[in-house]
Amino acid sequence: MSDLLLEMRKLRVEARGADGATNRIVNDVDLKLERGEVLGLIGESGAGKSTIGLAAMAFARTGCRITGGQVIFDGTDLMTQDEETLREMRGVRAAYIAQSAAASFNPAKRLNDQVCEVAIRHGVMSEQDAVKRAVELYGKLHLPDPDSIGRRYPHQVSGGQLQRVMSAMAMTCGPDLLILDEPTTALDVTTQIEVLATVRDLIRQNNNASLYITHDLAVVAQIADRIMVLRDGEMVEEGPTDKILNDPDEAYTKELVSARQAVVKPRIQVALPEHPVVAIKNVTASYDGRVDVLKKIDVVIGKGETVAIVGESGSGKSTLARVVTGLLPPREGHVEFNGKPLSAALRQRSKDDLRRIQMIYQMPDVAMNPRQSVAEIIGRPLTFYFGLTGQKRDRRVIELLAQIDMDPVFAERLPGQLSGGQKQRVCIARALAAEPDIIICDEVTSALDQVVAAGILKLLDRLQKATDIAYMFITHDLGIVKNIADRTVVMYQGDVVEQGSTVDIFTPPQKEDYTRKLIASVPEMRTDWLDEVLRERGDLFDIDAKVPA
């Protein structure tokens, strides 16, 4: 049996726009992938990474089609096969882990039903064996309560947990080819280490071939044997991972590598603000009235200040944002805005309260109406809050698109015609349209490539300096926190472990073991970093972090 599993020859993919015109989005790409090998596909949003990944299964998104070239899988040209043959192959011999797990699960079905569906439907194994296999994978992917988590619905697990469930779903049938499209995007740094190590080990044990699509160069350094750099649907260069990251030949690759070090310098601000924009006072919150997911939280955010909220998946970061925005009334305590108590429930707040507190969500796929154009999505707050219509609204939409570095032609596109990064930028523009006093940024850069993320952070910083807007910045990317936040709040299982100026939090030695664990988990752009962490820093990840009394 040949070691070569996948080969693409002169692959071409075209997309049809709303005006009917076609645009080539992948142009004559050649690719080879052997069994047991991981090829990283990197590049900016719109580079064609996900399109190439889907083409490995002879599949194209709605509005796109493969117009030329060959996709040879285990000796068979998939472009010559009928749709029924391709359906039998997809999910069984080749599996895809999507960038947005939230948009990939049926909210009305339990997780086990969806994870086991392909294996049962294709006759790969019985229902009993499929569930047993799913539970085994849940454990390997470090999901809590692996024996019972499959009986939950998608909304009953965190975003990071749902992403790992999707990884289990892809691996259930033991495919020859795994296509991983940003599989750790939604994961906190400590979970990311565990999942990266597990996925890498499973690939090695099963001799899988894998396409690993990512914009995070530090992540791809830990798992890829080779890297292919893409730009505007064309290959820029390809080579061993260490060579591409440390000695690239092409100027564009050098730009990608340097973009990861692009930072916004932090402003040292130790003192708490005297007149905060938002004050969270003694807040306790619960979804079911029995289990508290937030416990007596006190946080203040001042005018023109960036406060980062960090912690692992399930620590309560996004729940805290829901309390501030009124989506989840607290069981105890309250939130003040500019010194006045805010109504706990969203429906009781004034239109001006709603305008002044905006939120950018973690999952852009579920935050936009798929049937509305970009202009309609951005224009809605312009009409609702300011009464703008017609040409005035259209002009303001174009201005907002320019602020987020998107061409005016995007105004008429639908969300399904955008890349992951483009979708998130539209969500940012929608928040900016309301001209708020504070924006709650929930993983705002997690779906963006390094170059675009750096641009967005600079944009947010520029807006803050010009308008004194405040940011509550929820993230698991501590590299971002270190570079943009004035103060940092560390959370664990609904408690605040510690909070203070970002400089103090990140300057060793850390006061709390849990904070030290988080900081030690930030990936570095070295190919040996993951092995070094697992070998030399293992004691950190065995800590049963206790929240101070």
Where are these regions (language model features)?
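Conserved ABC ATPase "signature" region
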Residues: 77, 129-148, 392-409, 520
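Conserved ABC transporter NBD signature motif
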Residues: 65-77, 333-344, 353
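Helix-to-loop junction immediately C-terminal to a conserved catalytic motif
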Residues: 57, 61, 325
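Conserved catalytic motifs of ABC-family nucleotide-binding domains
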Residues: 174, 435
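Charged, flexible cofactor/metal-binding loops and thiol motifs
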Residues: 144-147, 241-279, 290, 502-549
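Conserved ABC ATPase signature
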Residues: 152-157, 161, 414-418, 422
